[in-house]
């Protein structure tokens, strides 16, 4: 049977000027084979908690996953992590609002600067998060040349687009 795992770890990082994110579980009627992942690590900058959650509507699948995770000792968490997880989601709203405003300002600055000052490179305006996709095809460089350019001349380490597929 096919299972769909929907990684929603960035779901809360949507800019106020964009459409709110709709989790996959709210869009499909048959959730029998759906697993949704969430975590406060990105939203509330709490990766040190080492805690995330799986939403598994199907009780059989939930039991099977619990058995696998128990066998690998992956369901052990400490009270500090659980408290931080809950506190982030219960009381982190004001902090998240400030974070999104800060990230939106950075997004606007980066997109404006790249699109006006860097010929051959086009920045896409993201709807959320802290990542920006750059279209560098206008530079006319191979993937290897592009990587060398960014690392050695621009002093910026990047995830090369080619690792996401031919269209980069």
Q: Which ranges hold each PLM region?
A:
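PLP-dependent class I/II
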Residues: 1-168
């Amino acid at each position: 049977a096919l299972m769909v795992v929907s990684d929603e770890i960035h779901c809360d990082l949507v800019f106020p000027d964009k459409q709110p994110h709709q989790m996959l579980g709210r869009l499909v009627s048959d959730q029998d084979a759906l697993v949704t992942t969430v975590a406060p690590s990105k939203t509330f900058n709490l990766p040190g908690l080492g805690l995330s959650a799986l939403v598994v509507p199907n009780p059989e699948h939930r039991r099977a996953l619990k058995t696998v995770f128990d066998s690998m000792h992956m369901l052990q968490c400490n009270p500090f992590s659980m408290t931080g997880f809950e506190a982030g989601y219960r009381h982190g709203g004001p902090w998240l609002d400030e974070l999104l405003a800060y990230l939106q300002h950075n997004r606007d600055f980066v997109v404006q600067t790249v699109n006006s000052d860097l010929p051959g490179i086009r920045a896409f305006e993201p709807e959320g998060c802290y990542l920006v996709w750059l279209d560098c095809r206008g530079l006319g460089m191979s993937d290897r040349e592009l990587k060398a350019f960014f690392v050695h001349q621009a002093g910026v380490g990047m995830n090369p687009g080619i690792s996401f597929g031919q269209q980069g």
